[in-house]
Amino acid sequence: LWMLQTRVGKRTAAAALHIAIEMEKEGLITKEEAVQRVDPDQLDQLLHPQFDADADYDVVATGLNASPGAAVGEAVFSAEAAVVAAEEGRKTVLVRWETTPDDLAGMIAAEGVLTSHGGKTSHAAVIARGMGAPCVCGVDALKIDAEAKQAAIVGTDIVIKEGDMISLDGTT
């Protein structure tokens, strides 16, 4: 037997947990070893809200999964709109080109954050992770017109207007 190359297998948090449980059930490892095989950061991902993996849904745009979790709410294009909606008991997703410290109150008020710019180290990503809120950044197909309070998905006829219900998945 010749081994040419080895590497650590990459897997989702759910897959790592499932594998550890099954290996323990089969007697291949102890319960203690099973617990040690699941990274605490991965376990944290499983504690955030998630969409049903078997559900039918249409993905209209993709970006970087900057902070785990799922969110559903009315699209809002300013921090102020997110705060007002939260005060009225409405759930929102804050949609911005990118966030700044001025958007913090809106980020706190919103269920999740969606940006067309930025990455995993952007303001939106770092703050959302710190708050435990879902965030998707760098959605290139999302062209935002904050003044008109709407966003278009490039390559489609989809236009998201303020108040439209949207969802985002910061886990996958």
Predicted regions and their residues:
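Predominant activation on well-ordered alpha-helical scaffold segments within soluble catalytic domains
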Residues: L17-I21, E32, T92, V126, ...
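Acidic, glycine-rich flexible loop/linker segments
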Residues: W2, Q50, A71-A81, G89-K91, ...
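Long, charge-dense accessory insertions within large macromolecular proteins
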Residues: E26-L28, E32-T100, G112-V113
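Terminal amphipathic helices with adjacent charged low-complexity linkers/tails
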Residues: L1-V60, I160-T172
